[in-house]
Amino acid sequence: MCKSKCVSLQPEFEQNPQKIVMITSFTAENYRSIDGEIRLSFKADTGIKDMDNRGYTTVANTHVLNAKAFFGANSSGKSNVFKAVGMMRGIIIHSVRLNDNETLPYDAFLLSDEEARPTRFEISFVDGTDKFTYGFSYTAQRIEEEWLIVKFPKRSLKTLLRRTPDLIEIDAQNYPEGLSIKDGTIPLNNNRLFISLAAQLGGEISKRVIEWFRTKPNVISGLQDNDFSHYTKEMLHTRADYKDEILYFIGSMDVGFREVITQQEYIDEKLLPKGLPAEIVASLKEHPPIVAYAKHEKINADGEVMGVVDFDIDERESDGTRKLFNLAGPIVDTLRQGKSLFVDELDAQLHPLLSRRIVTLFNCAETNPHGAQLIFTTHDTNMLSKKLLRRDQVVFVEKTVRTHYSTKLTPMMSIKFDNGSKPRTDSNYEKNYLEGKYGAIPYFEDEFEGCNE
C-alpha cells in the first residue's frame, strides 16, 4: 500500500540524511481539565501488523510512532492535552527572561478540593542515539521539582539533576555544568528552571534540551491557523529551498492552483492609523507584511487556457484552501526537519480526503524519511480506518462523572470489553466507536427519534 501510493506524494522532498529526533512520551498532571496524571506513549507496539506502511521510525533501538490521533466528544479535554505540551514548551523557552518577582503561568484543575497542588509536566525524547527525560512541577510562585535523566550509548541510565524545594542534587561527573548553580555561586531564583540557567551559562547538555524544545515541537490550533499564514508566506518569499516543496504539497491537494507568488508590501507611514504605537510602526517597517497570490488559469468555453488571474489567497480563497495554505509551511518544515507537529482540530474546514492525505505523508517512510511526527485531534471518524491508522496510533479522550470531570485518555490498545476481548484487527473501528463501544462519545439523556416529538 505505502510503496504504491506514497512515493508519488512528494517526489521532490529532500532526502538528506540527518539525525533522527522524536518524542517517545509526554506526561501531564493538574493542568486545566487534567486532574490526575495522563501519559501519552509514542512507542509502537511491534506485535501488531495493522498496515503495510509500518507507521513508525526506528531510532536508538526504539520503534517510535510517526502519527497519533485523538478522538473524543466536545469538551472532553483534547485541546488541553495539546495546550499542556505548548505550556511546557513556553515555560522552558521563556524561563530565562523571568524576573524573580514574576509569577509562573499556573492554570490548575479547578474541580478538586486540593488547593495549590503543583502542575507537573514530563517529556521523553530520543536525540540520535541519546535518550532524554526532562520534567518539572510548579505553582504560580515557584518551581517545586525538576529532574533530568539521560541514557547515552553503552552507558547506564543517569539522573543528572534532581531538584526539590529543599535540595538540589546533580551528577557532578556527568553534569559538571550544574555545579556552580548547585553550590550557590550562581544564584537560582525560585521561579526559574535549573536547566534554563545552566544553558545560559553554556552548559552543553542543558543547551541541547533547551534547543530541542525551541526547534522541534510545534503546537498549532486548526481553528486558529491564520497565525501560521505568515510562516508559510515567509518561507515562500525568502526560502527558495522550501518553495518547490510547499508548492508541490499545495498542488498535490487539488485546490485549483499550483503556483503561488508572493509580494512584500511597502509600508507608508502616512497611511497608517493615527496614534498607532511607535513600536508597532517600527515592527511593520522592519517586517513588512507579505501577500500571497494564487495563480488561477482563465479558461474559455472550449476549455482553452486564455491567461492567468492572480487571487489574493487571504481575500478570495475558501476557508479550507486558506487553512491548507497556512498549514503547508509547518507541515513541509516538519517533514523536512524531522520535527513534531501537534495540530488541534486537524480536520476542521478540510475535506476528509485531504486530512487523510496529510496523515499518510507522515505514516510513510518514503515521504517521511526523517522521523517527523504528526499528533492531532479530530472529529473525523473516517480516519478510524486500519488502512490509515494503526491501533496503537489511536487514543480516545473523555471527561465524565466517572472521571470526576477530569480528562482521561484511553489508548485503543488498552481497551478491554466485558468478555475480556480487545478490538480485533478486522473490526470496523469507525462503526464500533460511533456505537459507543470505545467510549469517548457524547451521551444524550433522551433518544431523538423524530422531528415531530
Q: Which residue stretches match the model-derived regions?
A:
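Conserved ABC ATPase signature
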Residues: 67-74, 278-332, 340, 346-353
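Conserved Walker B
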Residues: 31, 345-350, 381
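Short, positively charged and aromatic/hydrophobic N-terminal segments
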Residues: 3, 8-10, 18
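Electropositive, glycine-dotted interaction segments
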Residues: 133-271
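Extended helical coiled-coil dimerization/tether regions that scaffold
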Residues: 29, 228-316, 429, 437-438, ...
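Conserved P-loop NTP-binding catalytic core
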Residues: 55-69, 73, 82-134, 139-143
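C-terminal lobe/lid and adjacent interdomain/linker elements of RecA-like ASCE P-loop ATPase modules
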Residues: 17-25, 357-453
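Pre-Walker A-like glycine/lysine-rich segment at the N-terminus of P-loop NTPase domains
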Residues: 13-87
